[in-house]
Amino acid sequence: MKKVLILGANSYIGNSFQKYIGENYNDQYEVHKVSLRGEAWKEDDWSEYESVINVTAKVHITNERFTEVEIKEYNDINCTLACEAAVKAINEGVGQYIFLSTMSIYGIGDSKKPVVVDESTKPNPQNPYGKSKWKAEVGLNKIFQNNGNKQKTKLVIIRPPMVYGEGCKGNFQTLVKLAKICPVFPDYPNGRSMLFVDNLSEFMAQVIKNQMEGV
């Protein structure tokens, strides 16, 4: 049985993944969770885990202007913590470190200027969330390339779009409420990618099962 550690005790994606595994792969995976708040996690022993999934993040953006304190918080949570956790995973011989990044590293589009992403699209983050996640990706790649990685820990970076499902937060719930109360829904083409949380959970399960690496 593969042992998996989720970094982020209150993450929607992390909680959904744990529930999905319990319902579909209960005999194949043992999933634990830990919070990265404070310093206690640094004393934990991760050597027993096959994979560590980092879903800790500061995500929701409700304004267009950010203070220096807010920007620092994005960087501290989304980048610095991610890199510190990766170093711990490597040093303790974890087989695989999975980092949940975001499609926001490619920029934020709108109806007048959509951002179409394919394999050749270059990162161009436009807000503190996207910038901090991209900074984390760059930092993680340097860590895995430059420190010797004697234990051969594999790095996986996943860049999901907006994730929806039961109990999700963000804009999707607003759309659901609108659809329920509006008798006539406009015929408007959707240009935004969305991913059902169970599909993301299944993908992560396969990534762990096959010990994959890369973006």
For the regions a language model picked out, list residue spans one by one.
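N-terminal Rossmann NAD(P)H-binding glycine-rich loop of SDR-like oxidoreductase domains
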Residues: K3-G22
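Glycine-rich NAD(P)-binding loop of the Rossmann-fold in SDR/ketoreductase-type enzymes
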Residues: E73-L81, P123, N127, K131-S132, ...
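Conserved Rossmann-fold NAD(P)-dependent oxidoreductase catalytic core, especially the SDR/UDP-sugar
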Residues: C83-P128, G148, V156
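Conserved beta-loop-beta element that borders a ligand/cofactor-binding pocket
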Residues: V138-E166
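A conserved pocket-lining segment of Rossmann-fold NAD(P)-dependent short-chain dehydrogenase/reductase
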Residues: K177-L195, Q206-V207, Q211
